[in-house]
């Protein structure tokens, strides 16, 4: 995961203990949170990238039973921004989505993408929020940011295919699903979509 850029913090000493979850309250400025730990070193980022390469190689294997663990490890790495304050915004946005509160989720996640524009998972989660809010244009734009930062983000490719299919762009939707399956061939949703779209487009190619 590309770490979030360092952000200035207030001079006040951080409070003891973890910050309380804001629930469905209005998003708070990340600058009011306790100072984030120092960013990962270049060596740590390189090691993380090497770990991801190994996990993606394992994920791409069509057989075997270890792909699920590889998927879990990839998602865990992607969920870390490198900043405690940004991670808190991410968790608050995620909690709001789980509660069905897309307005609050978008508030938290917009603050996250503003302060940590290199954190791909922030863009991805905001894309999901836009999609659930019925706003496909911004949702697709956010997926573009995700794929710019992490071209192997299979979740973003599958989500892009879903949105394009809803918009009637079946050919590009099919291509997005196919690209996603090249990275993660075990996604049932993408497999079903490829079969459905190939059958639908078969007649138009005749």
What are these regions (language model features)?
Residues 175, 181-206:
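Terminal, low-structured helical/coil segments at or just beyond the last alpha-helical repeat
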Residues 98, 132, 166-167, 196-203:
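Register position in tetratricopeptide repeats
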Residues 83-156:
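Alpha-helical adaptor scaffolds
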Residues 64, 79-86, 141, 170-175, ...:
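Alpha-helical linker/edge segments of TPR/alpha-solenoid repeat scaffolds
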Residues 1-87:
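N-terminal leader/linker segments that initiate helical-solenoid repeat arrays
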Residues 126-127, 133, 160, 167, ...:
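Residue-level signature of tetratricopeptide-repeat
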Residues 64-67, 102, 136, 170:
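TPR-repeat structural position
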Residues 56-57, 72, 110, 144, ...:
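Alpha-solenoid helical repeat scaffolds
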């Amino acid at each position: 995961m590309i770490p979030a850029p360092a952000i200035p913090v207030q001079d006040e000493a951080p409070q003891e203990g973890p910050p309380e979850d804001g629930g469905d309250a209005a998003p708070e400025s990340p600058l009011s949170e306790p100072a984030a730990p120092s960013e990962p070193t270049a060596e740590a980022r390189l090691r993380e990238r090497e770990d991801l390469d190994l996990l993606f190689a394992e994920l791409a294997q069509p057989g075997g039973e270890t792909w699920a663990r590889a998927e879990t490890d990839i998602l865990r790495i992607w969920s870390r921004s490198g900043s405690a304050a940004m991670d808190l915004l991410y968790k608050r946005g995620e909690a709001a989505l789980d509660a069905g509160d897309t307005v609050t989720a978008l508030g938290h996640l917009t603050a996250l993408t503003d302060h940590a524009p290199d954190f791909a998972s922030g863009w991805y989660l905001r894309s999901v929020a836009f999609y659930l809010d019925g706003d496909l244009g911004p949702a697709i734009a956010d997926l573009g940011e995700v794929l710019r930062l992490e071209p192997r983000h299979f979740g973003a490719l599958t989500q892009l295919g879903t949105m394009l299919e809803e918009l009637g762009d079946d050919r590009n939707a099919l291509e997005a699903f196919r690209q996603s399956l090249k990275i993660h061939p075990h996604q049932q949703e993408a497999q079903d979509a490829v079969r459905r779209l190939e059958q639908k487009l078969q007649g138009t190619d005749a």
